[in-house]
Structures are given as structure tokens and as C-alpha cells.
Swiss-Prot record:
Carbohydrate attachment residues: 40, 216, 279, 380
One Pfam family hit: PK_Tyr_Ser-Thr
Source organism: Arabidopsis thaliana
Listed name of the protein: Probable receptor-like protein kinase At5g59700
GO cellular component: plasma membrane; plasmodesma
Amino acid sequence: MGGEKFGFLIWILSIPCLIFLCYGYVPVDNYLINCGSSTNVTVTSRVFISDNLASNFLTSPNEILAASNRNSNSDIYQTARIFTGISKYRFSVARGRHWIRLHFNPFQYQNFQMVSAKFSVSSETHVLLSDFTVSSRVMKEYSLNVATDHLELTFTPSGDSFAFLNALEVVSVPDTLFSGDPSFAGSPGKFQGLSWQALETVYRVNMGGPRVTPSNDTLSRIWEPDSEFLVEKNLVKSVSKIASVDYVPGFATEETAPRTVYGTCTEMNSADNPSSNFNVTWDFDVDPGFQYFLRFHFCDIVSKALNQLYFNLYVDSMDVVENLDLSSYLSNTLSGAYAMDFVTGSAKLTKRIRVSIGRSSVHTDYPTAILNGLEIMKMNNSKSQLSIGTFLPSGSSSTTKKNVGMIIGLTIGSLLALVVLGGFFVLYKKRGRDQDGNSKTWIPLSSNGTTSSSNGTTLASIASNSSYRIPLVAVKEATNSFDENRAIGVGGFGKVYKGELHDGTKVAVKRANPKSQQGLAEFRTEIEMLSQFRHRHLVSLIGYCDENNEMILVYEYMENGTLKSHLYGSGLLSLSWKQRLEICIGSARGLHYLHTGDAKPVIHRDVKSANILLDENLMAKVADFGLSKTGPEIDQTHVSTAVKGSFGYLDPEYFRRQQLTEKSDVYSFGVVMFEVLCARPVIDPTLTREMVNLAEWAMKWQKKGQLEHIIDPSLRGKIRPDSLRKFGETGEKCLADYGVDRPSMGDVLWNLEYALQLQEAVVDGDPEDSTNMIGELPLRFNDYNHGDTSVNFSVAKEGRFDEEESSVDDSSGVSMSKVFSQLIKSEGR
């Protein structure tokens, strides 16, 4: 009986293969299961077999089949299988890519209310869903590259909850569908290793056309219309010429996208006003913290001849392709189907991907642009996750794997023991050398300063001095056990509390949130950086605590909070223009000090108004060094590193090239300058499209010479024109597209001092002289590190904790303005 049942199953599974023959692609594996059902169901010519026939694929501690949702318009959503314990599906498959489609439609069955179900789904290599809940019908589609002869899917209920599934698809994917190395969106280079990435389909969109159902797609995909994603629907028109589509050999095929997608498009509606200059934009909400694979589908169905369509393609306002001529890609074929692949990491910093098309600025005879289709797929992170949550897979429980592991362990156990013993010996010798050499290697610390700890986070011996360590009991006493009434802020690292130490010192206590994406690396960097610095314009670190796996940083308390809170959103009194200039000058001094250290320069990497704090006298201090990076070696121009920072302040060149320099801080500081001037957020999605990004908005008015039109209303009529002009010119230079064109922080500092002097009094000579740009400054003032040492003493060595030098500037508090007044007046020399 069992043989007959299995033979029938094979026959059933062969039916879809016969159907696919008429489309050209025959999947090697094609498992379609109607979970919870005792009968087969045909959906759009595909047969989903009953749960009874699929029982050979499932290992589950309980057999609960639910069937009560008779209101569903699709048979596969009328039943479900409920898992009350860890359950596994195991399929024999050919190696290669496979679609995994999980169908969910919650309903109530007996005591099981499926909307309250919470569970995780994982393969042997990737986490697909973590702590997943579902309130309405949804289909989750994944593409996994299977490297073995089987695929295992595990359903794990969270806590006392349960899991459920309405239908399951495991179907082969053509090997050529995801191949090659896609380009990075907006930056040079290519992403290598796409073939082994796990992908989750987030959006699959048919631009300008209707919804495409599985019956009209050779790979049974669903394509949604683009209308709900368009930002301005009145700027476009839909075009449909399905019969014109030409699949050119060697390029896109019907497996890439169906004819219905390539035969329709969304086109710029520029016919009424061909001279108008606008972009067509689509916005897509995504999960932050991941890279995304983007596939653009193009087919020129709007031109009457070759070389009549040139346009630009943008992703998150970055140029991806300029002057795109589709016919040049397709061997001079009109209406040829073509796909372009990119990888973007911009979603790591935001919850949205913005895609735009716009007319070419070079080929203006044909002012239009098109897009036929778009696919957006989430890529697994470094932890092989496609969903971030608390779930951690325990690994395969296969008996075979355990046996193999045991055999290997017994075989090489003695060898490993020798290696471990040898390793201990090497570490012991190295530790002795490091201690003799006063190394900064990070090692565990105990509360008494020794190098062993059972409960401490792995940290470093900070400059061989444990005086920075503060006991947890002292921190709790200072904050009244982290009383929420003492909370004064919250950030990416965790909450900040106001506290007071035994000696009466007021402190700000930053306590890490265990769920924060910032962790040990940022904690370590903050301590390492701030323990080296002593400067009046950098926030001082008082100590840290790492007991009981806590990560706590204790700083000097800044009475007036963040610069951001004094600009907008808090209802505080408005700052005067002089106060704002002095705050900018103080911040610039702090950054200049970081960039021009005695050893390697330090790049802050997260300059923003929220990281500039103000003391009781409104003196500015730069804070938050968790993302800071030591600058390049003397013979190098940059540091290659993963992009980190805050959206809106991020240097676009750093984002494109992933090459960090001091000029990245200069760009961010330029954004802060315009934020100070305009008193508005750097990104404000509530405003019109052209005003959303402050840097772009301010640069537009600065280049017009009309910056006064967008300044903080409370400052109108209170800023001298020449002071505003110098401030605007300086900010404009900071926001140059390329770092080489930006000034150093020393140049910025000099010009800000100049702007302050222009505000306070008219300098000798013609005030129009103040219009000179940064690049036109006398050579003497272009770089504080190379000028006349008799002039530069208060800047070039500003603030390093050196007894002889600190008396000159840092400790004495000599105003830069006094020195500056000698620089700009001829009689001062």
C-alpha cells in the first residue's frame, strides 16, 4: 500500500512538469503541498498535493490539520497544518537555486487563534523568519542555493506558542536567473558572491501594467502594479505594446520576466511640457540593516527608431546609470528585453529605497524616460539571516551529522589537544611581550585590575590604567538604579541617564540596550578614543563599567544637552547668530584637533547636531566616538571601511567608494552648518520633494546667492550680509561632491572665525573683500599645519594633553578670536 501511495505521489508531481513543457522551462524539483488538506487542489494549472500524500516529507511531533476557513477565494488558504513543536520538512532536491514559497492565511481552529501564532522558519543554512507573526494573508518567497542533495525547512514555535502553514512550494530555479556580479548602486565595483546569497523577494513590480499572476509567468511569480509606489502619479503615463517585445539571444528571457512585464512600462509624461525637468519616483519601504538586490527591467516600446531614448536611472538620489541608451546594449535592437542588476546598501541607514528615472541632460531631443519592471530582494546578512529576531537555529539534528562529527572528533582529538596546548604556550609568550611593550590589546578585566574576569565584557587595559573602571554599584547609586525619571535621552547605543557621583560630580550615564545593533565594538572604540583625549571641545570620559555583562559609559554632564535640541523640536529659546557661530567654532576646533593629532588622525564618522553637546555656558563639545576610526597612514590617502554614519549627514563619496578620509567629517560638518542656519531637520519627509534633503535644498539657494530666504525666521534681520555670505560659502565648500575639493577643518575653523568677526564689527577695508572663497585664501592660512609657527601656536597643536601645550590653549581657554583679530588686521602683524 505504501508503494502504491508513493507511486501515485510521483505521478501527481509529474503533472506540473508536463504543463511547464509548453512554457519552455521544466523545473527539476516541483513540490507543491496543500497543508492541512486531505485532497489535492489545482490552482492556476498547478496541482498542490494533499497533506496525506506529503506526509513522507514531514517530521512533526503532532498531527494537527485545521480546516475551517471556507471564506477564502483560494483553496490552498482554506486549510492549514499546525505545529505545536519543532517540525521539519525534508525534500530530496537537485543542487542549485530553488524557490521556497510559504503561504500564510490565519484563521481560528478550535483553541488555535492563528493571528496569535509566533514562530521562526529556517533552512539548514539560513534564518528565513524570526519570531514571525501574521495578521492577514501573505506569501513569503525566498530563493536559496542548495549545496546538498536535500533541503530541510524547520518550523520552530516561540515559547509556548505554535506555528502554522497553509501551503508550501519548493521549486527549482533556472541556474542563469541569478548569475554574474551585480554592480553597486551609485559606487564603483561589483558585488561578488551573489550566487550563494539567500534572497527574499520584497517587491516584484510591473510598471505601467496590470497584476501578473502565476499562470502568466513561466516561473509562477506574481508581479504587482506600480501605482501604489509612485510618488507623483500625475507625472507619468502607462504604455502597453506587448506584441513588440523581442527576446534577444544572450540577454533577458521569459524566465527573466514575462512578456507582460517587458511589454508595458511607466513613461515620463513630458509631452505636454517637453522643457520641464522632473524625475519619476517610486518609494519602497524596506527593513533597515540589510543590503538589497535590485533588478531593473527595460524594453524600449516607446521609440519609433533606434537611439531615440536616453535617460538617467537613480537609486536613493544617486546616479546609477547616466544617459542610458538601451539600443546600444542590445546590438541595435529596438524593443529588446534587457535587465540590469545592482546591489544597494543604502537601506542599512534608512527604511526606504527610492528609485527614480529622469531625462538625460545631454541628449535633450528626446525628453523622456521609462521603466518596465523592478524586483527588490533582501540579501542575507553576515549572520545568514533574512529576518532579525531572537531566534537562533540550533543546527541540524541529523543523526548522520552527529555520527560523522563523533568519528572526526575521535580521529583528530589528540591532534587538536596538541594544537590547543601549543596555542596556550604562544599566547602566554605573546602576553608577556605585550605587557612589556605596553600593548593596547583588548583582554578581559576583573574588578581588581587583573586579567581574568568571569562576568566582565571583553575590554582593553586602557593605557595600562584601570582607574577608568567604575563599580556597577556606584553607577546604580548615581542613577538611583537607572530610575526612568532620570532618563534624559535615548540613542542607538541605549538610554542616557543623569546621575551624580559620591563627590558631587554630575554625570551622564549611557547604558547599552541588549537589543541595540551597536555593541562591543562601539563600546570599545568609545573608551579607547576618549581615554586618549583631553580637549575642552571634546566630551570627557569619566569612566566605564562592564560588570555583569553590562556596557556602561560615564561622561561629564552637559547641562544644555544637544545642539539639535536648541535648533528645533524642543521649544527651547532660540540661539542668537553669535551663539550659533561660537558653537560651530567650538565644534570645528574639536574636529580639527582630532584630524591633526600628534600620531594618526582620528575620523569621527558620525558628526551631527545630536552629537554636539553644550555645557552650562553653551560651549560646544563633540561627543559619541563609537564609530570613530583611526585615519590613514602617512603614505595612504584613505581608510577602506564599511559605510557607517547617520542618514542625511553621510558623505556621498564615502558611501560610493567606501573610502573614509577626514573630508568625510568635513562634509557632515557642512550639513550641520546649514542645520544651524536653517533650524530644521536634515531629512524631513513631511516637506515637498525638493525640500526634503536640507543639504540639497540649502545648496540650491546658496548657489543662487539667496541663502537669506531659507534661514531660521528668528535670525532674519539679525545677520550681517557679509557674515552670512562667508558662512554660506564655507558650508558650500564643505558639501563639495569630491573630498579633494573640500577644505580642511583648519580652513573651516579659520573661515568661521572670520564670519564671527564680520558679524561683530566691520573689518578694515572694503567689506566686499569678505566674498573671497576658501580656495582663494592666502597660502599662509590654507593649512594650520604648514603656516607660520608664530601665528599657528594656538591651533596647530590645540588640545593634546601635554603639560607644556595645554597651558597655551586647552586649559587656559585663550579665545581663538583674540589671535584671529591679529591675523585679519594688517596692523596686527
